[in-house]
Amino acid sequence: MAHPRVFFDMSADGQPVGRIVMELRSDVVPKTAENFRALCTGEKGFGYKGSRFHRVIPNFMCQGGDFTNHNGTGGKSIYGTKFEDENFQLKHTGPGILWMANAGPNTNGSQFFITTAKTSWLDNRHVVFGSVVEGMDVVKKLESLGSQSGKTNKKIAVVDCGQI
């Protein structure tokens, strides 16, 4: 079975930036991949459409997925508020890796990161569940809107999203 592919159509201050296509590793982390896929489609009545990338640090990552508070303090999974770390088989090997944000072990919700560099120090601490397969140029454009504090100089938003 092919790995599910999902997309984000991104904007900065209301101007289109482009599409990011991500492949989800449902073969290794099925529960984590399904959470992200369903949040992309919005099929549970909530999800990423209209949400923001609230934190972007150049040469590290872009963070999004807080569709409830829009500032990094909220979000929820399709399983309730938080769910367990499925496994740590996949690693943070370089730019374009998708991984779950957490507040410690077994606290996965909807927030996620896209790496813009190798981040191997996060192995065995954050669940990797996929990677960018198209639109890494869009990720780099978004990265350029960040700062060392993580504050973005434009409002970065997911205008549309879904499964391909």
From Swiss-Prot:
Tissues/organs with expression: Ubiquitous.
Record-linked PROSITE patterns: CSA_PPIASE_1, CSA_PPIASE_2
Protein EC: 5.2.1.8
Record domain PPIase cyclophilin-type: where: 7-163
Known regulation of activity: Binds cyclosporin A (CsA). CsA mediates some of its effects via an inhibitory action on PPIase.
GO terms for cellular component: cytoplasm
GO MF assignments: cyclosporin A binding; peptidyl-prolyl cis-trans isomerase activity
Enzyme class: isomerase
A Pfam family of this chain: Pro_isomerase
InterPro entries: Cyclophilin-like_dom_sf, Cyclophilin-type_PPIase, Cyclophilin-type_PPIase_CS, Cyclophilin-type_PPIase_dom
Subcellular location: Cytoplasm
Key words of the record: Cytoplasm, Isomerase, Rotamase
BP-aspect Gene Ontology terms: protein folding
Catalysed conversion reaction: [protein]-peptidylproline (omega=180) = [protein]-peptidylproline (omega=0)
Family of this protein: Belongs to the cyclophilin-type PPIase family. PPIase A subfamily.
Primary role: PPIases accelerate the folding of proteins. It catalyzes the cis-trans isomerization of proline imidic peptide bonds in oligopeptides.
Identification of the protein by name: Peptidyl-prolyl cis-trans isomerase
Species in which this protein is naturally found: Blattella germanica
Record gene name: CYPA
